[in-house]
From Swiss-Prot:
Keyword Kinase attributed: no
CDD domains: PLA2c
EC number annotated for this UniProt entry: 3.1.1.4
Stored SMART domains: PA2c (SM00085)
One term under GO cellular component: host extracellular space
UniProt note on tissues of expression: Expressed by the venom gland.
Swiss-Prot/TrEMBL cofactor(s): Ca(2+)
Enzyme superclass (EC): hydrolase
Protein name: Acidic phospholipase A2 DE-I
């Protein structure tokens, strides 16, 4: 019950492209980003510090780094454009900044899919921040 409440609170704050990111993760990895990656390891979810704990957590680290390189738009609440053709998703639109945000999200969704076998909910779901105190590697 507590987990459901936490997820409901997280969803209340989701606007703009974060819902698009959730959709991309569902389409590509076949998993809910909120449920699977909303609080996983040291980098999946809000914030991020320390060393990525496994390849799935590294997907979130790389995603955070990707967002850090985007300038000129809000990475969390502006909508971007993408298209689907024959199962392939392509980021587009007139705004180069939002296209970059889409490409960050798309790369993360593909990374999650490619690392489903490394996902370890028993070990890294709701991972305590006190275990993420090692020095972070550079992006």
């Amino acid at each position: 019950m507590r987990t459901l409440w936490i997820m409901a609170v997280l969803l209340l704050g989701v606007e703009g492209h974060l819902m698009q990111f959730e959709t991309l993760i569902m389409k590509i990895a076949g998993r809910s980003g909120v449920w699977w990656y909303g609080s996983y390891g040291c980098y999946c979810g809000a914030g991020g510090q320390g060393r990525p704990q496994d390849p799935s957590d590294r997907c979130c680290f790389v995603h955070d780094c990707c967002y850090g390189k985007v300038t000129g738009c809000n990475t969390k609440d502006e909508f971007y454009t993408y298209s689907e053709e024959n199962g392939a998703i392509t980021c587009g639109g007139e705004n180069p900044c939002l296209k970059e945000v889409c490409e960050c999200d798309l790369a993360a969704a593909i990374c999650f899919r490619d690392n489903l076998d490394t996902y370890n909910s028993k070990k890294y779901w709701m991972f305590p921040a006190k275990n993420c105190l090692e020095e972070s590697e550079p992006c």
